[in-house]
């Protein structure tokens, strides 16, 4: 069954005026739903807030918009832990069209807290999460991740092994010299996990180079570097076929991705602990 995903790459109100992003997001949801979108994907930390102490929480507004327009809304915010210590989890959430409590993923990588302090946009002491939840929807199983976790293949693989067929991995802001490798890795995560992977990012002005993208295991379905919203048709039947079937001699004549790489034909989990022993890690300084 084909369904539609709206990928929103907004001009973002910066820290200090970021509460204004909520109204912009509500308008984008209404427009996307009017074009038949059953998922609307915003960037990391959009609508916000970007900093601690948090001055607003967009969750109720995003849930209300999802219910009003009968769509799923993937959005970014933070979950304050301690206002005095300025600690928070960084979240990617998904609001449901039936109004249930939103799905939430707490960013897990890298080791915190250094990544969200000292720059011009974010300012909080990030506390990593430690779970890789996967969420059921009427269209398929959804995994959530974010931003430079694309450089950690373990994140998307964990979601895929838990059944995620559609992985939203929205990002924060201008990637500068990382742009080309980032783009490559979004598609790589789709190829190696036999999944649809979706990303987008915030733009603070029209001079910045964006990266909005929908990748399947066999093709890039959509990509854009400019501000705006695109509605993309997606079908998970091919993903399910590639996962359910076995690779064999000559299969490359019909398949542009390797079949069955998540299953026992390819996987050898008994080797992986020897390859990569996992000592207890300290947080990075």
Task: Please place each PLM-identified region on the residue numbering.
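CN hydrolase (nitrilase-like) catalytic-core segments centered on the catalytic cysteine
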Residues: 55-75, 141, 147-230
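Active-site-proximal beta-strand elements of phosphoester/diester hydrolases
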Residues: 2-14, 104, 140-149, 168
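C-terminal beta-strand edge segments of enzyme domains
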Residues: 202-285
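Acidic/histidine-rich helix-loop elements
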Residues: 11-20, 117-120
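Active-site catalytic loop in hydrolytic enzyme cores
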Residues: 83-162, 175-184
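Active-site beta-loop-alpha junctions enriched in small/polar residues
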Residues: 10-13, 78-80, 106-110, 147, ...
């Amino acid at each position: 069954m084909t369904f539609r995903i709206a990928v929103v790459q907004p001009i973002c109100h910066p820290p200090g005026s970021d509460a204004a992003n909520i109204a912009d997001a509500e308008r984008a949801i209404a427009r996307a739903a009017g074009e038949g979108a059953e998922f609307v994907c915003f960037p990391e930390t959009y609508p916000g807030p970007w900093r601690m102490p948090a001055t607003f929480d967009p969750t109720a507004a995003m849930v209300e918009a999802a219910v009003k327009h009968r769509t799923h809304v993937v959005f970014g915010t933070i979950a304050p832990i301690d206002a005095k210590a300025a600690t928070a989890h960084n979240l990617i959430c998904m609001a449901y069209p039936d109004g249930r409590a939103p799905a939430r993923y707490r960013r897990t990588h890298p080791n915190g807290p250094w990544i969200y302090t000292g720059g011009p946009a974010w300012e909080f002491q990030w506390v990593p999460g430690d779970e890789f939840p996967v969420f059921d929807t009427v269209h398929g199983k959804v995994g959530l991740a974010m931003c430079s976790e694309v450089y950690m293949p373990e994140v998307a693989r964990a979601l895929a092994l838990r059944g995620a067929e559609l992985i939203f991995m929205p990002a924060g802001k201008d990637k500068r010299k990382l742009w080309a490798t980032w783009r490559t890795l979004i598609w790589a995560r789709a190829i190696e996990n036999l999944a649809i992977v979706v990303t987008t990012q915030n733009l603070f002005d029209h001079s910045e180079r964006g990266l909005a993208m929908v990748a399947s295991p066999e093709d890039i379905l959509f990509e854009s570097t400019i501000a705006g919203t695109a509605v993309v048709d997606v079908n998970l039947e091919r993903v399910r076929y590639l996962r359910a079937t076995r690779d064999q001699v000559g299969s490359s004549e019909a398949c542009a991705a390797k079949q069955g790489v998540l299953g026992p034909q390819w996987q050898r989990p008994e080797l992986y602990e020897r390859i990569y022993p996992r000592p207890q890690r300290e947080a990075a300084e």
